[in-house]
C-alpha cells in the first residue's frame, strides 16, 4: 500500500488500484472510473488495494460491491468510512470530513447527498448508475450539437480525450524520485531508471545492497573479493561502474541516500560497506549522467537508496538470524511504527565472516533510526541518523600475500528535512551531515618490515539542499533547486612506538549550485524535458551542465525516448593534495551521453521489455602520467553499447525476468564487463517461495596496465528460498556459486566456490 500511495501522488491521478501485481491508474474526478471498472472487470476489484484522493459514500459503495481488500484515502467522508468498516474492509486515511463537497465548494456533492440516507449498497447502485448515465447523456448531447456547428471536430476531440483517460496498466516500480527530485511516473521521463524494490532486496538475504544491484541492473557492476565485506584502501573491493564509467576508486558514479550525496570527504568516493539492505525501501539506479540534478560525480549515473518508511497505522517488528559458510553470521532487527501523525523506523544489525582465505575476516555492526511527523496536510518533518562500524582484513593477492593489512572504519550520516506536497506542488528543504573516522594499517609483504605507523583520517561532508516543484499549467512541471556542500577533512600518520603524529593533509572545499528542470506534456503522446545546472566549486571554478530529452507515448502501452545529457566530476582532495602523484591544478572531467530507448507493456501489463542504445564521449579524465609522476587531465572515454530488460508474470505462481548489457570500450577499464547477462525465475505458492538466477559475465577486465592485461569469464548459479513455518516465522536458505566456478573479480583474489547460508525470519 505504501508504494500505491506514492503512485497516487506522483502524477495527476485521482485513484490507483492494484490487484495481482497489476496496477490501474485513473484520472477522472468522481466515481465514473470506479463505476466503469465494476461494469467491465469486477474480478479485478476483488481483494484489490485502492488508493484514492477523495472517497465519498458512492465511491465506498462501489468498492464494497467490488469486494476490494483495503482502501487508503487522502480525504474520506464519515458515511463512506462507516460503510467500508461495516463491510470489514481495512481503511486508512489522512483526513475525515462530515461529507464530500461539490466542485464549487458551495454545498454537498450531488452523489454524496443522493446516497446519504440510503442504507444498503444494493439501494445505492441504481442511484449511481442513473446519475452517471444522466451526466454522460448531457455530455453526448453537447458534443453532437457542437459537432454540427464545427463539422465533427468536437466529436473527434472528445473521443481523443476519453481515450487519454482510459485506465493504464502500470507497475509499482514506475514511480521514481531520482530523475526529477519529486515523485514522478517514469513514463514521463526521458532518462532510464532501474528500480529494485523491497521484495527483491529481501529475497537476496544479503547484508549489502550491491550484490542485488549487480544482478538486477543492466550495465551496473560491483567488484567483490569474498563472502562478506569490501574494505577500503589496498586490495579493497566495492568498486562500482555503470556503462564503463565509475573508476577505481568509484568517483564517477554517485551514491545517494534519499537524494543526499554519500562519499568520503577527502577521497571523494563512496564507502561500499555503508550501503546496507536494512536501510532501503527500494533502490533507484539512473543509468546515465545525472549531473543536472545532482552535480559532481554523477557522470556515469546515480544510485539512490530510498529509505524505509511506514504509511499505515500499525507496528511491525522483524528479526532475522542467519549463519553459513566460513563462519558467516548475519543478523538484523527492525521496528516500524505509524501512529497518527508520527512514524518511525529503527533497525540494527551485526554481521561477520572469517572469509574463505586466512586473514580475510570482516565484522560490522551498526544502527539506523528515522522519525517523521506530519505537521499538517501536505507538510512533513523527518529526520534520520545512521552509524556503522566495521573491521576488515586484507590478505593480499594469492601470489603476493600481505600481512597485518587491517582497517577500522566508522561512518555516520544524519539528515533533517521539511517536506511539502500537494496536488500541484512538492518540495523539500533538507540539511545533511556525513562523517567518517578511518584507521588503517597498510600491512607489509613477505621479507618486509611491519609498518611503523598507522594512517588516520577524519572527514566530513555537510550541506543544504532545497527544491520546489510546481505545476504551472496543464501538463507542466517546473522544478528549481539550490545545493550547497562543504566537504574535506584531515589525515595524519601515527607512529606505533611513540604515538607521534605526522600531519598529512588538512583541506576543506565548498560547492554551490542552482538548477532548473522543465517538463511539459504535449497532448497525450509526448513529454518534453529540459534542464540546466550552474555549479561553482571553490577551487576549480564554474561548470555549466545542460540536458534535454523527449518521451513519446505510443499506442499499445509503448514508450520511445531520446536523451542528451552532460556529466562532470570535480577533482577530489586526494587527487589534488594527497599522496604522490597529487596535482592541485587539475580540472573537472566531462562527458556527453546520447541515448535512445524503447519499452512496452503487453498482456495487460504482465509482460514488459525494454531496449537501450547509448554512446558516451568524454575527455579531461584524470589519469596518472608516469613520466611526470603526477595526475593530469589527459584521459578520454568513448563507450557505446546496448542494454535489454524483460519481465513476465506468467501467473500468480511464476515470474521470470532477464537483463543483458553489451559494452564496447575504446579504452578498457577494470570492473566493467563487456557482457553481463542475468536470467531469473521466482516461484511462490502456499508456504513456499523460491527464486533462482544464473548470471553470465564475459570480458571483465581485472588488469589493464601496459605490463598486464587480464580478463575473466564465468557463470554463477544461485538459489534462494523460504518456507513459512507459521504466520510469523519463515525459514530461509540460499546457495551461491553452486557450479563452483573458479574466477576472480579483483586480480589476485580468487572468489569462493559454492557457499551456503540458512536462517530464520520472525515478523510480528
PLM regions and their residue ranges:
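Flexible loop and strand-edge segments within Gram-negative outer membrane beta-barrel domains
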Residues: 353-360, 364, 374, 378-461
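Short acidic/polar hinge/loop motifs at secondary-structure boundaries
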Residues: 260-287
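Conserved C-terminal beta-signal and adjacent last beta-strands/turns
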Residues: 159, 372-375, 562, 655-656, ...
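Gram-negative outer-membrane beta-barrel transporters
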Residues: 521-524, 613-617, 633-701, 739
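Structural signature of Gram-negative outer-membrane beta-barrels, strongest in the C-terminal barrel
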Residues: 376, 473-477, 502-617, 651-652, ...
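Outer-membrane beta-barrel signature, preferentially recognizing the C-terminal barrel domain
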Residues: 398-421, 457, 507-509, 557-559, ...
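Short strand-turn segments of transmembrane beta-barrel domains in outer membranes
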Residues: 302, 307-336, 348, 353-360
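Extracytoplasmic beta-strand/coil segments of soluble accessory domains associated
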Residues: 214-260
Amino acid at each position: 500500500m505504501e508504494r500505491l500511495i506514492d503512485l497516487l501522488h506522483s502524477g495527476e491521478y485521482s485513484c490507483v488500484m492494484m490487484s495481482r501485481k497489476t496496477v490501474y491508474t485513473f484520472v477522472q474526478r468522481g466515481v465514473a472510473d470506479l463505476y466503469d471498472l465494476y461494469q467491465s472487470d469486477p474480478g479485478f476489484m476483488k481483494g484489490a488495494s485502492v488508493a484514492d484522493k477523495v472517497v465519498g459514500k458512492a465511491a465506498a459503495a462501489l468498492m464494497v460491491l467490488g469486494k476490494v481488500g483495503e482502501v487508503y484515502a487522502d480525504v474520506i467522508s464519515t458515511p463512506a468510512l462507516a460503510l467500508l468498516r461495516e463491510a470489514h474492509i481495512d481503511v486508512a486515511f489522512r483526513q475525515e470530513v462530515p461529507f464530500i463537497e461539490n466542485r464549487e465548494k458551495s454545498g454537498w456533492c450531488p452523489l454524496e447527498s443522493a446516497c446519504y440516507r440510503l442504507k444498503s449498497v444494493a439501494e445505492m447502485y441504481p442511484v449511481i448508475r442513473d446519475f452517471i448515465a444522466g451526466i454522460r447523456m448531457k455530455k453526448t448531447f453537447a458534443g453532437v450539437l457542437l459537432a454540427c456547428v464545427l463539422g465533427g471536430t468536437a466529436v473527434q476531440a472528445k473521443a481523443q480525450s476519453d481515450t487519454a483517460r482510459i485506465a493504464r496498466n502500470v507497475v509499482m516500480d514506475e514511480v521514481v524520485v531520482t530523475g526529477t527530485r519529486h515523485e514522478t511516473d517514469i513514463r514521463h521521463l526521458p532518462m532510464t531508471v532501474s528500480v529494485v524494490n523491497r521484495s527483491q532486496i529481501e529475497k537476496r538475504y544479503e547484508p549489502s545492497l550491491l550484490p542485488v544491484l549487480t544482478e538486477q541492473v543492466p550495465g551496473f557492476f560491483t567488484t567483490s573479493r569474498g563472502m562478506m565485506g569490501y574494505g577500503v584502501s589496498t586490495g579493497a573491493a566495492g568498486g562500482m561502474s555503470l556503462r564503463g564509467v565509475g573508476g577505481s576508486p568509484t568517483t564517477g558514479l554517485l551514491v545517494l541516500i534519499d537524494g543526499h550525496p554519500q562519499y568520503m570527504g577527502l577521497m571523494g568516493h563512496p564507502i561500499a560497506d555503508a550501503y546496507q539492505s536494512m536501510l532501503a525501501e527500494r533502490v533507484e539506479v539512473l543509468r546515465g549522467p545525472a549531473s543536472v540534478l545532482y552535480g559532481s560525480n554523477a557522470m556515469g549515473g546515480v544510485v539512490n537508496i530510498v529509505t524505509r518508511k511506514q504509511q499505515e497505522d500499525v507496528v511491525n517488528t522483524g528479526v532475522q538470524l542467519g549463519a553459513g559458510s566460513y563462519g558467516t553470521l548475519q543478523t538484523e532487527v527492525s521496528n516500524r511504527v505509524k501512529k497518527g501523525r508520527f512514524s518511525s523506523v529503527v533497525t540494527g544489525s551485526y554481521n561477520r565472516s572469517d572469509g574463505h582465505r586466512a586473514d580475510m575476516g570482516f565484522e560490522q555492526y551498526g544502527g539506523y533510526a528515522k522519525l517523521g511527523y506530519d505537521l499538517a496536510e501536505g507538510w512533513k518533518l523527518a529526520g534520520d541518523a545512521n552509524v556503522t562500524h566495521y573491521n576488515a582484513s586484507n590478505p593480499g593477492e594469492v601470489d603476493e600475500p600481505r600481512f597485518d593489512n587491517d582497517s577500522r572504519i566508522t561512518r555516520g550520516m544524519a539528515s533533517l528535512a521539511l517536506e511539502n506536497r500537494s496536488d500541484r506542488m512538492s518540495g523539500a528543504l533538507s540539511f545533511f551531515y556525513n562523517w567518517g573516522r578511518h584507521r588503517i594499517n597498510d600491512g607489509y609483504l613477505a621479507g618486509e618490515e611491519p609498518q611503523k605507523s598507522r594512517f588516520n583520517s577524519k572527514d566530513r561532508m555537510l550541506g543544504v539542499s532545497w527544491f520546489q516543484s510546481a505545476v504551472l499549467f496543464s501538463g507542466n512541471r517546473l522544478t528549481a533547486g539550490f545545493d550547497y556542500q562543504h566537504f574535506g577533512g584531515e589525515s595524519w600518520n601515527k607512529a606505533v612506538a611513540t604515538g607521534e603524529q605526522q600531519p598529512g593533509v588538512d583541506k576543506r572545499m565548498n560547492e554551490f549550485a542552482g538548477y532548473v528542470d522543465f517538463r511539459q506534456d504535449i497532448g497525450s503522446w509526448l513529454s518534453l524535458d529540459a534542464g540546466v545546472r550552474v555549479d561553482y566549486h571553490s577551487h576549480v571554478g564554474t561548470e555549466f551542465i545542460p540536458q534535454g530529452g523527449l518521451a513519446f507515448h505510443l499506442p499499445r502501452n509503448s514508450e520511445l525516448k531520446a536523451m542528451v545529457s552532460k556529466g562532470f566530476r570535480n577533482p577530489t582532495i586526494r587527487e589534488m593534495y594527497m599522496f604522490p602523484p597529487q596535482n592541485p591544478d587539475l580540472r573537472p572531467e566531462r562527458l556527453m551521453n546520447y541515448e535512445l530507448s524503447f519499452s512496452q507493456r503487453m498482456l495487460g501489463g504482465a509482460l514488459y521489455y525494454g531496449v537501450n542504445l547509448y554512446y558516451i564521449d568524454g575527455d579531461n579524465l584524470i589519469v596518472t602520467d608516469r613520466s611526470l609522476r603526477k595526475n593530469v587531465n589527459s584521459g578520454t572515454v568513448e563507450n557505446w553499447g546496448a542494454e535489454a530488460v524483460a519481465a513476465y508474470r506468467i501467473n500468480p505462481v511464476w515470474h521470470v525476468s532477464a537483463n543483458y548489457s553489451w559494452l564496447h570500450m575504446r579504452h578498457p577499464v577494470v570492473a566493467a564487463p563487456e557482457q553481463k547477462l542475468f536470467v531469473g525465475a521466482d516461484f511462490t505458492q502456499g508456504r513456499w517461495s523460491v527464486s533462482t538466477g544464473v548470471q553470465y559475465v564475459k570480458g571483465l577486465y581485472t588488469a589493464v596496465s601496459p605490463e598486464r592485461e587480464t580478463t575473466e569469464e564465468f557463470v554463477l548459479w544461485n538459489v534462494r528460498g523460504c518456507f513459512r513455518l507459521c504466520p510469523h516465522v519463515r525459514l530461509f536458505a540460499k546457495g551461491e556459486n553452486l557450479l563452483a566456478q573458479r574466477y576472480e573479480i579483483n586480480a589476485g583474489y580468487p572468489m569462493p566456490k559454492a557457499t551456503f547460508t540458512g536462517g530464520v525470519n520472525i515478523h510480528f
